[in-house]
Amino acid sequence: MKVRIRDFIETTEGLYFAVNTYAHPKNKFFAFLRYVPYEFVDFKIEDNNIREINGRKYIKMAESKIAYKFLEEKFSKYLYYDETINVLMHAIPKEDVKRILRPKERLNEIINEENNLNELEEKCRKLALILEDYGVPIKSMGVSGSLLLKLNNKNSDIDFVIYGKDMHKKAREALKQAFEDNKLKPLSDDFWKIAYKKRIKDKTLTYEEFVFYEKRKYNRGIVDNTMFDLLFTREWDEITEKYGDKRYKNLGFAKIEGRVLNDDFAFDNPAVYKIECYNDEDIKEVVSFTHTYAGQCFNGEEIVARGKLEEVIDKSGERYKRIVVGTTREAFNEYIKIKR
């Protein structure tokens, strides 16, 4: 039994968790709580966060602090203090896994079912076939998020997954060409405003800055008036790190400047930027656990970053430092920007 980022796990109680890392302890899976059955909830709920499938209502956990509080009060067995990073994590013991939902399998289901698709499924199928026309094979695609769980509503986006770093780059190039050929549309100002409101919870990026960075990523677009993301997940042979290979020590917060040396996994989760740091030569990388700063900068660009400073201790004895952006999902006062 193995999982990777963008997979979802359903527990025996019907809770849905999104897998958020590639390396897991022996008897648990790290994954973040995303949906819970309505009957477990006793706090105020926004209508847009209520979903339903087969007559059962679910609540989308839109904020990380609410998700943590819910687990502390109702399902503390799904909280696990990870000593390698010294952080309290959401984690599912393997004996509590009811099933694993995989994006590739769900997309194949949609591709092969021409009839009886709902509106969002039809749009997802159309997107997949357009990307296939530009040379991206179906076998390198999947769909995650609410559409994977069949918990989508009229306001849902499409979390479209591309597997493998080379294929994700090809898909972004395909999207750029599809925009030029008018097969798919870039986001309008109205959609960018929705995306900005969803992503930025403080003033670390102005709206104008946000749009500047997002437009050059070519990982977002519109299919028949519905927004989609092209999300990256590693192919199995690209997953090399094992749980416990590295340990992390919190050194506080820091702001640094540097230059990007390697952006191969800039769209991953975490997004990884190998850098030359101007402030401290021991800082070798900047990583982002929030989607906002994935693909934010590219090889050769000079950057400014603020986040948690960590010492990384490899099991071989090697030590270096990194900056971590996205210590919470909202990434308050943490950022990666091009140096102006």
UniProtKB/Swiss-Prot annotation:
This is Uncharacterized protein MJ1086. It comes from Methanocaldococcus jannaschii (strain ATCC 43067 / DSM 2661 / JAL-1 / JCM 10045 / NBRC 100440). InterPro entries: Polymerase_NTP_transf_dom. Pfam families: NTP_transf_2 (PF01909). One of its GO terms (molecular function) is nucleotidyltransferase activity.
